[in-house]
Amino acid sequence: VTNDDGVHAPGILALKQAVDPLGEVFVIAPMVNRSAIARGITIRDPLVVDEVEMGDGTLAFAISGTPVDCVRLGALGLIGAPPDVVVSGANLGLNLGDDVTYSGTVAAALEGVMLGIPAIAVSQDALGGGSGPGLDYDFSAVTRFAARLVPLACAARFPRHVIFNVNGPGVAPGALAGARVTRLGRRVYDDTLSLELESGSTRHFRIYGEPMSHDMQPGTDLSAIDDNLLSVTPLHFDLTDLAGMDHMARWEVDVLLTSVIQAD
């Protein structure tokens, strides 16, 4: 079990407790919040590993690196044999549409499948909507649902290059309308650049934006959340655009290369 909010975040404890009955559970998570770090890894500095106590008294590995570092450490021997499954979350806030390319939660799961380990990413909206610390969350439904998905993710018949991206709406479990298998929608942010401090030639900026538009078309993850449904989206790490390849097949790339060589 890992996350990007940090080893002491409430969501990872809830997820760990939900999957505890399934077998031996190891928690390997960042020491501090590493949200929106995507697939960043540590390559120049040593990774510091410390054992810390979680809220239920069990021990976890706290890592100085990123969520992807956590998965790599687990797969490469920190816990002995590689894990049978990686479950990442439960994130404080949704990871829908465009968010998945930024998300450390989703990246950790993708790293799992890239290493041949089935994986699930889990995210939860705050009650009433919103994300981040200081808000109220109910992780019970989304984490129990993720635990039920673990045997399916591990099934030999399921493609090993695919993760389940699970998102829970910001409602109490009794208000859930069900669950839906979805595709990614679009969540475009209206970003602004704010100058917060200026001292001589040094300036401090903050980039921030609220979602400007949502793709609420039927079948999208955003539409499911809007309908108070749990959303489950299969994702994979192959970013190839097959339609683009078909279009580019008409390009004479050899001719382009020849012209480049002749120009030199």
Put a short name on every predicted segment.
Residues 10-77, 81-82:
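A cross-family phosphate/adenosyl-ligand binding-site feature
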Residues 94-103:
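Glycine/threonine-rich flexible loop motifs
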Residues 85:
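Short, Asp-centered acidic motifs that coordinate Mg2+ and/or phosphate
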Residues 5, 33, 66-67, 91-94, ...:
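Short glycine-rich anion-binding loops that position phosphate/pyrophosphate groups of nucleotides
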Residues 74-80, 107-118:
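Alpha-helix C-terminal capping segments
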Residues 113-138:
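Glycine-rich phosphate/pyrophosphate-binding loops
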Residues 2, 28-30, 88-91, 121-123, ...:
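Short beta-strand segments
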Residues 137-264:
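Electrostatically charged, flexible surface regions
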